[in-house]
């Protein structure tokens, strides 16, 4: 949908499409018609029907949809909310993983702790099970 083709809807217009035969909802100020997707939704059609005609942004984000699901949404977009009725709910981003190496201090701790534990275990073993002189 190019920016020239964008259709704008009010919340009242979206609210009228709240049945199994016409299932629209709002996510991040975009309007989606997911009627054709009802039977394919992995969470079942009930989840989508429950949100029909409403702003489903919070529910959508709470579930933690994958990037594939977010990409798939684009084909069901039919328009956007009119500017006066938009909300400011930030999109949740995918978690980022920190792959940076730790400093030398933490690498020293990584071998020091097992060494100390091994030493303590050895001393305890020798104390309890050490050779006894006769």
Curated annotation (Swiss-Prot):
<dbReference type="InterPro" id="IPR001199">
    <property type="entry name" value="Cyt_B5-like_heme/steroid-bd"/>
</dbReference>
<protein>
    <recommendedName>
        <fullName>Cytochrome b5</fullName>
    </recommendedName>
</protein>
<keyword id="KW-0472">Membrane</keyword>
<dbReference type="GO" id="GO:0046872">
    <property type="term" value="F:metal ion binding"/>
</dbReference>
<dbReference type="GO" id="GO:0020037">
    <property type="term" value="F:heme binding"/>
</dbReference>
<dbReference type="InterPro" id="IPR036400">
    <property type="entry name" value="Cyt_B5-like_heme/steroid_sf"/>
</dbReference>
<dbReference type="GO" id="GO:0005789">
    <property type="term" value="C:endoplasmic reticulum membrane"/>
</dbReference>
<dbReference type="InterPro" id="IPR050668">
    <property type="entry name" value="Cytochrome_b5"/>
</dbReference>
<keyword id="KW-0492">Microsome</keyword>
<keyword id="KW-0256">Endoplasmic reticulum</keyword>
<feature type="binding site" description="axial binding residue">
    <location>
        <position position="41"/>
    </location>
    <ligand>
        <name>heme</name>
    </ligand>
</feature>
<comment type="similarity">
    <text>Belongs to the cytochrome b5 family.</text>
</comment>
<keyword id="KW-0249">Electron transport</keyword>
<feature type="binding site" description="axial binding residue">
    <location>
        <position position="65"/>
    </location>
    <ligand>
        <name>heme</name>
    </ligand>
</feature>
<dbReference type="InterPro" id="IPR018506">
    <property type="entry name" value="Cyt_B5_heme-BS"/>
</dbReference>
<keyword id="KW-1133">Transmembrane helix</keyword>
<feature type="transmembrane region" description="Helical">
    <location>
        <begin position="111"/>
        <end position="131"/>
    </location>
</feature>
<keyword id="KW-0408">Iron</keyword>
<comment type="function">
    <text>Cytochrome b5 is a membrane bound hemoprotein which function as an electron carrier for several membrane bound oxygenases.</text>
</comment>
<dbReference type="Pfam" id="PF00173">
    <property type="entry name" value="Cyt-b5"/>
</dbReference>
<keyword id="KW-0479">Metal-binding</keyword>
<feature type="domain" description="Cytochrome b5 heme-binding">
    <location>
        <begin position="6"/>
        <end position="82"/>
    </location>
</feature>
<keyword id="KW-0812">Transmembrane</keyword>
<keyword id="KW-0349">Heme</keyword>
<keyword id="KW-0813">Transport</keyword>
């Amino acid at each position: 949908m190019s920016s020239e083709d964008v259709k704008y809807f009010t919340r009242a217009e979206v609210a009228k499409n709240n049945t199994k035969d016409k299932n629209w909802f709002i996510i991040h100020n975009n309007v989606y018609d997911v009627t054709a997707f009802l039977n394919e939704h992995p969470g079942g059609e009930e989840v989508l029907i429950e949100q029909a005609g409403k702003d489903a942004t919070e529910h959508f984000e709470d579930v933690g949809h994958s990037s594939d699901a977010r990409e798939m949404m684009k084909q069901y977009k039919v328009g956007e909310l009119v500017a006066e009725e938009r909300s400011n709910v930030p999109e949740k981003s995918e978690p980022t993983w920190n792959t940076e190496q730790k400093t030398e201090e933490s690498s020293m701790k990584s071998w020091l702790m097992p060494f100390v534990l091994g030493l303590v275990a050895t001393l305890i073993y020798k104390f309890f099970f050490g050779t006894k002189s006769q």
